[in-house]
Amino acid sequence: SEEAPATVFSQKHDLSSGGRAVEFVSLDKPGEVPVRQSTGLAEFDRALGGGLVPGSAILMGGDPGIGKSTLLLQAAAAIARAGRRCVYVSGEEATAQVRMRAARLGLADAPVSLASTTSVRDILTTLGTMEPPGLLVIDSIQTMHSDTIEGAPGTVSQVRGCAFELIRYAKENGVALVLVGHVTKDG
């Protein structure tokens, strides 16, 4: 029994336990194609390749103030009005501010669930108590934090860790996830 050569990865990680088998599917075999979910905004759907895919994660980046939050609130309202549950979490604005924007856009009657928090643990704990939504918007990923990760909100480790936890939830539960990211001079 010949031992596999040690690699940088295997030297850093104990590969002898804790993993689980991953199911591979063949690219050339027909499979179930997920149904894309329209955002109700034709150009946004076109940019997404036809709409949102359940279990996918989208990073919407751009300069502050260009309309990312407004666009996503409009998409969430359209999806919610079509009968899919939508959750919009703002780490930057109070729910009252989001409601005021919705009223200005004529979306005040849309059944979108709003929350104003920055704790990924609290978000995931709450989502774990209910049926997964069709759409989860996190506005913005730079404001989120996880108490299991070192560093302040907005640091590379926090952004990566929080995004990882949210993406894992989305994939495991078939939730379309949109993370808002603000582009800054620092990148």
Question: Where are the language model's segments positioned?
Answer:
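Conserved inter-motif catalytic segment of the P-loop NTP-binding fold
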Residues: A42, V53-G55, G62-I66, T70-A75, ...
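Cys/His-rich Zn2+-binding cysteine-cluster or related metal-binding knuckle/ribbon modules and their
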Residues: S1-T7, I141, V180-G187
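Residue-level signal for well-ordered alpha-helical segments
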Residues: A21-V25, K29, V35-Q37, T143, ...
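Detector for small/aliphatic-rich hydrophobic stretches
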Residues: S1-I58, A80-R85
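P-loop/Walker A NTP-binding module and the surrounding RecA-like catalytic core of P-loop NTPases
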Residues: V159, I167, N173-G187
